[in-house]
Amino acid sequence: MRSEGDTWDITTSVGSTALFVATARALEAQKPDPLAVDPYAEIFCRAVGGSAADVLDGKDPDHQLKTDDFGVHFVNFQGARTKYFDEYFRRAADAGVRQVVILAAGLDSRAYRLDWPAATTIFELDQPQVLDFKREVLAGVDAHPRAERREIAVDLREDWPQALRDSGFDPDKPSAWIAEGLLIYLPASAQEQLFTGIDALAGHGSHVAVEEGAPMTPEDFEAAVAAERAANEQGEQRMFFQLVYNEQCAPAAEWFGSRGWTAVPTPLADYLRQVGRPVPGPDTEAGPMIARNTLVSAVRA
C-alpha cells in the first residue's frame, strides 16, 4: 500500500507501473497494424530484463499482458492512449505552442520520437531515480531528443510549480500539458492541487490533456485489493490496486470547463471504437477499467 511521502525507482511501487505500461507499448509496436509505435519502449524493457523482456520474446505466454481476459485489451488500451496523446501534442504544436510539460514523465519518450517544431522546450517532471534510469538507458543507445529537454526531479505532491519556473518555464507563454496514467496514483486533494497548478501556470492559448478514471465503489475497490493480495500470496506478481487511490477531485472536463477552458471528454471505450479496436465486455477483467476511463483535452482561449 502507499504511504505519505513514499518514493520509488523504475522497478518498485508506482515506478513499476511505468515499466508495465512500456511493455504493453512494446507489444503494441509488434503488431502488423499498431496504433502507435514507441521504439524506445522495448529498449527500456530489455534494460530491465526479466519478465519485461521475456514477454516480448514470447518466452512468457502466461504473462498478464498475454491473457485474453485482460492483456489483449490492456495492450490495445495503451496503443490507443499513446495515439491520443501523440495527436494532442501535434495539434498543440500546430497551434504554435512551444512549451511542453509532461507530468510524471516516467518512460515517456515523446521528446525523442515525435517531430517537434524548432524552439520547443519539453519539461519532464518525475522522481529523480526514474529520470536517472531513462537518461542512462537512452544515452546508452545514443538517442537524442528532438527538442530541448529539461528534467525536473520533483515529487508532484511537493512544490512542483516553483521547480518548473526555476527550470525556465514561462507562464506568460502558451504551454501544452499532459497527465497520462497519473491521476489514479494521487489522492483527490493532490489531484486538485495538480489541476490548480496547471491552471495558474497555463497562459492564454494553452492546452491540457489528462487521462482519468472514475472511482470504483468502496466495496468493489476493497474486493479488488483483497483479490490482488491473494494472487500475490500465490506467487503472482500483481501490484495495481494496492498502489492507486480510489478517489477523484472532480471530472477533469468539469473542473477545467468551470475555469474558462473549452474541454472535450472522450470515453476510452468510444475512442477504442474510433480507432478500430474492440471494447471488452463488462464480464472481462479489463472491461470495468476501460468503462471507467476517459481521455480529456482542453484549450484555454
Curated annotation (Swiss-Prot):
S-adenosyl-L-methionine binds at D126, D155, L156. The keyword S-adenosyl-L-methionine applies. Disulfide bonds: none annotated. It comes from the Bacteria. Pfam families: LCM. One of its GO terms (biological process) is methylation. It is an enzyme of class 2 (transferase). Keywords: Methyltransferase, S-adenosyl-L-methionine, Transferase. Its EC number is 2.1.1.-. GO terms for molecular function: methyltransferase activity. NCBIfam families: mthyl_TIGR00027. Exhibits S-adenosyl-L-methionine-dependent methyltransferase activity. Belongs to the UPF0677 family. This is Putative S-adenosyl-L-methionine-dependent methyltransferase MAV_4873. It comes from Mycobacterium avium (strain 104).
